């Protein structure tokens, strides 16, 4: 398994994986309400999610005990982006990312990631176009370096429609208990919807690799989104051939007084 993405049978969920080469798909043509990958009624899908999470929890303990592999889960969506701080801008764009990569035995989740630097930076012109262009190759090399050091990478784009995003933002305003989630920046970024879709399209084309694939997950239905991600994570962990480390000799003879 060292140095490459594990061989995983994702079954029908393979439809959401962006091929590593010659992707002819268009993000704007993909249905954010699609449910063909796991065509179950909601109760069955939620039961499957609960089962997958329980199995992930079990395997996470073995992952930690074995302390050989790490799993990095990258989540990106169509919400407001956090612009880099002046301190972050003073370093190379991967500086803050590398130090947050999970250690062996750990699972790390990036809620937003190094892809901000080819998304928000591109849309808002924070750096020259030639620097954006260079970053795609830099990201691929960085991710390859991680994989060669036993960090398995899963990247999920949570694909919702513009109409669904509007409904969710409005729901936050309408419900006093959800207003704390509202970010005015979401409204400003929403005006750049088409620009972001174009930036994501390029990122998928340039940075979905055999060693660090992108999955475009239909996310209009949160329960379906959760089911897909849980199943992909579970299937990936199962493919890592996780085992507990060998026990010390003579443990069966030890008696605790």
Residue ranges and their predicted role:
Residues 198-201, 205-257:
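NTP-dependent small-molecule kinase module
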Residues 67-72, 104-105, 212-213:
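Pre-Walker A (Motif I) flank of P-loop NTPase domains
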Residues 73-83:
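Glycine-rich phosphate-binding P-loop
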Residues 37-48, 85-137:
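Conserved nucleotide-sensing/catalytic segment adjacent to the nucleotide-binding pocket
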Residues 57-65:
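Pre-Walker A adenine-sensing motif
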Residues 120-138, 146-198, 246-252, 256:
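A glycine- and Lys/Arg-enriched "phosphate-lid" helix/loop adjacent to the NTP-binding pocket
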Residues 1-55, 68:
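Charged, amphipathic alpha-helical linker segments immediately N-terminal to NTP-binding catalytic cores
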Residues 64-66, 86-87, 99-103, 145-151, ...:
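Conserved catalytic network of the ASCE P-loop NTPase/AAA+ motor domain
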């Amino acid at each position: 398994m060292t140095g490459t993405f594990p061989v995983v049978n994702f079954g029908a969920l393979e439809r959401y994986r962006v091929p590593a080469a010659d992707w002819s798909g268009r993000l704007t043509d993909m249905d954010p309400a699609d449910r063909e990958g796991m065509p179950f009624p909601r109760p069955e899908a939620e039961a499957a999610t609960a089962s997958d999470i329980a199995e992930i929890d079990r395997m996470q303990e073995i992952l930690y005990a074995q302390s050989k592999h790490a799993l990095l889960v990258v989540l990106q969506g169509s919400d407001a982006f956090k612009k880099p701080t002046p301190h972050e801008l003073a370093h190379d764009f991967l500086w803050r990312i590398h130090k947050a990569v999970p250690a062996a035995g750990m699972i790390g989740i990036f809620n937003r990631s190094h892809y901000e630097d080819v998304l928000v930076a591109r849309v808002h012109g924070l750096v020259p176009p030639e620097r954006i262009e260079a970053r795609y190759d830099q990201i691929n090399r960085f991710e390859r370096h991680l994989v060669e050091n036993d960090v398995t990478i899963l990247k999920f784009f949570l694909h919702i429609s513009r109409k669904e995003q509007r409904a969710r933002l409005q729901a936050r305003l309408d419900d006093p208990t959800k207003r704390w989630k509202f970010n005015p920046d979401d409204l400003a970024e929403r005006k750049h919807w088409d620009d972001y879709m174009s930036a994501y399209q390029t990122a998928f084309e340039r940075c979905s690799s055999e060693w660090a694939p992108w999955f475009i997950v239909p996310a209009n239905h949160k329960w379906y989104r959760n089911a897909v991600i849980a199943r992909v994570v579970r299937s990936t962990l199962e493919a890592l051939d996780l085992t507990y480390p060998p026990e010390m000799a003579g443990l069966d003879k030890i008696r605790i007084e």
